[in-house]
UniProtKB/Swiss-Prot annotation:
Lineage of source species: Eukaryota, Metazoa, Chordata, Craniata, Vertebrata
Main location: endoplasmic reticulum
Region annotation Disordered: where it falls in the sequence: 398-553
Highest taxon of source: Eukaryota
GO cellular component: chloride channel complex; endoplasmic reticulum; endoplasmic reticulum membrane; Golgi membrane; membrane; nuclear membrane
The name this protein goes by in its record: Chloride channel CLIC-like protein 1
Entry keyword annotation includes NADP: no
UniProt feature, compositional bias: Basic and acidic residues: 454-474, 507-537
């Protein structure tokens, strides 16, 4: 097929145009390549070592004075600037070439060794694989804590040390095997297992240490304290019971509070379904209204909202008052022992009667019941007599000892009545209890006149007192004759005692002398008023050592008061029994004569007139 001339001409023009475009594009590429491939040695700041081309400068092209600015090719000026110093450039080139050779030798030596990077890549991949089984951190959990066991053998340790010491003997396979066996058994971190425990440090349980310490403390308390030998067992049991009862109150209160708290939690769960209805979050429909009407009309159920707010507002601690704890403690104190005793008796009877025939079970049961009743009755009687000590039949109740420095009030004898004399002075009634009260009532005139020979021994008694205060004298205590009181056994065991003179005896003697002077003045005044005319008759008196004084109260059954005075003297540390006179009237300081009351250094007996 032949083409027309016009079509052939158009085709030629199109081919020419296409060739022209190809030539121009090739020219542009060559120019651009040459432009970008050219490196300015004076502008190394804009040199990019990665692409090995010059960066395009952002500086303005109008600055002609910048030395590092790459000059554009100017057709008008084709002169190439010469190097200012050729030798200096050559010198720098040699230095750079030398440094380049050194770096090349180092890199060659490094590349000659086996590369350990793949080993650590495999180790890290294994680590991530094991931890991914337990869970990896994500957006919800920023960090996770894992636990793993480290297994290290001798060969693995040697390979790791070779790598750390930069030795050439280590290999990639040995290192890979060593790292793969280090971390085994991955698991999540257990915080409780890592807490400090007393057992891990001291290898002993805390409970064992506390029990041993308590036993040692009890032993030390028993050895050191003296209460076990002084206080009676009944008093110790009573104190222990009081302490146990107080501890039981607190114990039961905490127990009741825990029970109330647990009940409160259970009620909260039960009334949770009424939350929306009682708080108004849910509107009541016709079914709820119908059920509410049925509850109020036909049932006796409480309002669920009332129960809901009671559970919500009332604190469980208010449900356990102290009175409730006291009541339950007393109830448990009475019922729990009986319950345990009944269980023990039941098990005992069951074990006793199970192998006996029926004919013997009834007699054995009766005997066991009688034995239990007798034991309970005897224990109750002993406890009652221990708590409340009733006076025995035929014995008089023991009177409490008088206070320190206080005289016991005189008592009339049972067979005598008070004397009647009107307003006139009458002699004090004579007590036959002991010699102390017998001599203590000598302030009365009648008694003084009856015992005039003894009142003449003033000087001799003063000598005896001075002798007693300057030396140690054995004191002998006499035991009353007749019916003895059980508590007087200690006086018979302490018949001979040695008394040391000291500050207490000297102070007592001074007080006695002062009181004697006052009593002597009163006695002299009364004696002058009632003095008899037959005063000049001879007086015969025995020396003090031979005075025979018989205890009056011993034969009259008043030994109880003597024992009481001895106890009182022993409790207050007084080793000397000094009997003082009782002042019956006011003292007169201007009387010249003085008389003294009797003070006995040795217990003597007085003849009964």
């Amino acid at each position: 097929m032949k083409l027309s001339s016009s079509s052939s001409f158009g085709l030629c023009i199109l081919v020419v145009f296409f060739c022209f475009v190809v030539i121009e594009s090739a020219k542009i590429r060559i120019d651009g390549y040459n432009d970008e491939a050219w490196i300015d040695p004076y502008d190394m700041l804009n040199y990019d070592p990665t692409t090995k081309r010059m960066r395009k400068s952002t500086e303005s092209e109008s600055y002609q004075n910048v030395p590092t600015k790459r000059r554009e090719f100017n057709s008008e000026s084709c002169d190439v600037p010469k190097c200012p110093d050729e030798h200096e450039c050559i010198k720098k080139l040699h230095i750079l070439q030398k440094e380049f050779d050194e770096q090349k030798s180092k890199s060659t030596a490094t590349l000659s060794k086996p590369v350990c990077l793949p080993v650590f890549k495999r180790f890290l991949s294994k680590l991530l694989k094991e931890t991914s089984k337990l869970g990896l951190p994500d957006d919800g959990i920023t960090a996770m804590h894992y636990d793993a066991e480290v297994k290290l053998s001798k060969q693995s340790l040697a390979e790791i040390q070779k790598l750390l010491n930069d030795e050439d003997g280590w290999t990639t396979g040995a290192m890979d095997e060593a790292l793969s066996q280090i971390l085994v058994q991955f698991k999540l971190h257990d915080y409780e297992a890592w807490k400090w425990r007393f057992e891990d440090t001291f290898h002993v349980d805390v409970d064992t240490v506390l029990k041993v310490s308590l036993i040692v403390l009890i032993i030390v308390a028993i050895i050191c304290t003296q209460l076990w030998s002084v206080v009676s067992w009944f008093v110790q049991f009573r104190r222990m019971f009081a302490v146990s009862f107080f501890i039981s109150l607190i114990w039961n209160w905490f127990h009741l509070y825990m029970l109330a708290f647990a009940e409160h939690k259970k009620n909260i769960v039960q009334v949770e379904s009424f939350n929306a209805k009682c708080t108004g979050l849910k509107q009541l429909n016709w079914q709820d209204s119908l059920s509410e009407w049925y509850r109020r009309t036909w049932t006796l159920q409480d309002d669920p909202c009332k129960k809901y707010y009671e559970v919500l507002v009332v604190n469980p601690i208010l449900l356990v008052p102290p009175t409730k704890a006291i009541t339950i403690t007393i109830t448990n104190f009475i019922t729990d022992p009986l319950k345990h005793i009944g269980e023990g008796i039941s098990e005992f009877l069951r074990a006793l009667l199970k192998d006996l025939p029926v004919t013997l079970q009834i007699p054995v049961l009766i005997i066991i019941i009688l034995a239990i009743l007798i034991f309970v009755y005897g224990s109750a009687q002993a406890a009652i007599h221990q708590v409340a000590r009733f006076p025995r039949l035929g014995w008089r109740q023991e009177q409490p000892p008088p206070a320190v420095g206080q005289r016991q009030n005189p008592q009339l004898r049972a067979h005598e009545e008070p004397w009647e004399g009107g307003d006139a002075r009458q002699p004090l009634p004579m007590r036959q209890d002991n010699r102390g009260n017998h001599v203590g009532n000598r302030g009365d005139q009648g008694f003084r006149d009856a015992n005039a020979p003894e009142n003449r021994e003033e000087d001799r008694s003063m000598d005896i007192r001075q002798e007693f205060s300057t030396k140690r004298t054995p004191v002998e205590t006499l035991q009353a004759t007749g019916n003895t009181f059980p508590d007087d056994e200690t006086d018979s065991q302490q018949r001979t005692q040695e008394l040391d003179s000291g500050a207490n005896v000297e102070e007592e003697v001074k007080v006695e002398e002062k009181e004697k002077k006052e009593s002597f003045s009163v006695d002299n005044k009364e004696q002058k008023e009632t003095k008899s005319p037959d005063r000049s008759e001879p007086i015969t008196s025995e020396p003090p050592s031979s005075i025979d004084v018989k205890t009056v109260g011993a034969d009259q059954g008043n030994e109880h008061l003597m024992c009481t005075k001895r106890k009182w003297a022993a409790q207050n540390g007084f080793k000397l029994q000094v009997i003082l006179c009782e002042i019956n009237s006011e003292a007169s300081a201007d009387l010249p004569e003085e008389e003294e009351c009797f003070s006995f250094k040795h217990p003597v007996q007085e003849t009964q007139s």
